[in-house]
Design a protein with these regions (language model features):
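Catalytic machinery of carbohydrate-active enzymes
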Residues: 1-344
Length: 344
């Protein structure tokens, strides 16, 4: 049976948007083994994908080339005898390891002029394929062939035992309905709903008898503390207190998720959680959360602003209207319009 190495994207959201590609490969090649090469910060997500047999975790950070290290890893991977590699990032360096591993078929987009490193080249027509999920899915087809109808949306396995252990460690319970807030956004502050809005929203939910958990990385710990304090501890700050795998498992019990445009937003959709997705400087046109049904996601933003989306890390005009004017009342209406959660 064929063995294929997937070079996974470097962002959590992009990684989940690549899952329909994996389903398509399995459809085209029954019995295929898919392994994935993934950075440490996304490996936990890839490991929860049923299409993936094995995750090879790397420590390559954004930026440095580390050519010698990539050469050594590629040489070591020669013993795996992969038949093909599919390279999802467009960077030059992401195509080096399959080349050094001497994998016969190396598939990907031209990207950063990767002639020679790749030998099955796709040219990307961004206007024809505006959605990132469809762009990735194109790599399962022959160059120039149309993308097949989407087979599946992202889906992540949940580790029930790990969830219970994490809840016990953190002193959490599910005696009340749980809402999860994801206050972070790796890209920058222009994608983050203000802390005072989140705190106000947490108090409104607490008044309804809802338990509010804040999930995020250690980078979000400070803003989580701020939200918890402003909410009178209506929100429990778990940012930085779990790894990504535990965050996935905790999120799986949420009755609702409210998230900025971030990796955890895509995790919520993959878990079938009813989701209010908040957009400010970014747009859902290219990388929307993919859910089992559109009714599970409420895309929420301020319409009619000429300056939005600006795709900037910080508001270039200083007023931050796109998220400042997104009121807790509006978000509560969106949350109330959501259907019940699906089984995770």
């Amino acid at each position: 049976m064929p063995r294929i190495l997937i070079i996974a994207p470097n962002w959590i959201g992009d990684t989940l948007l690549a899952q329909p590609l994996l389903a398509r490969i399995h459809q085209r090649l029954p019995g295929v083994t898919l392994d994935a090469l993934a950075p440490a910060w996304t490996a936990s997500v890839v490991a929860r994908m049923p299409e993936i047999s094995r995750v090879i975790e790397t420590d390559f950070a954004h930026g440095p080339l580390r050519l010698a290290d990539r050469w050594r890893l590629g040489r070591n991977l020669r013993t795996e005898h992969y038949d093909q590699s599919v390279v999802l990032p467009n960077t030059f360096k992401s195509a080096l390891i399959p080349f050094f591993a001497d994998i016969p078929l190396r598939v990907g987009f031209v990207g950063e002029s990767r002639y020679g490193l790749l030998n099955v080249m796709h040219k990307l027509d961004e206007n024809k394929l505006p959605l990132m999920a469809d762009r990735y899915a194109q790599l399962a087809e022959k160059p120039g062939d149309p993308v097949a109808p989407r087979l599946a949306v992202p889906h992540l396995a949940v580790n029930e035992a790990n969830m219970l252990i994490t809840m016990a460690r953190l002193g959490l319970d599910r005696s009340k309905p749980v809402a999860v807030f994801c206050p972070g956004a790796e890209y920058g502050p222009a994608k983050r709903w203000p802390a005072h809005h989140l705190a106000d929203f947490a108090k409104r939910l607490a008044a309804r008898g809802v338990t509010v958990w804040l999930l995020g990385s250690n980078k979000d710990r400070e803003v989580g503390d701020d939200i918890a304090a402003q909410s009178g501890n209506a929100a429990i700050n778990l940012c930085g207190r779990t790894d990504l795998a535990a965050a996935i498992d905790l999120m799986s019990v949420a009755r609702w998720v409210v998230s900025n445009d971030s990796g955890l937003m895509h995790v919520a959709a993959a878990l079938g959680r009813p989701l209010v997705a908040l957009y400010g400087s970014s747009s859902p046109e290219h990388t929307p959360p993919l859910a089992h049904t559109d009714k599970l996601v409420r895309i929420t933003r301020i319409d009619g602003l000429e300056c939005s989306p600006c795709y900037q890390r910080e508001c270039p005009l200083g007023h931050f209207r796109c998220l400042n004017e997104l009121s807790p009342e509006r978000v509560l209406l969106e949350l109330d319009a959501l259907p019940p959660a699906l089984a995770a």
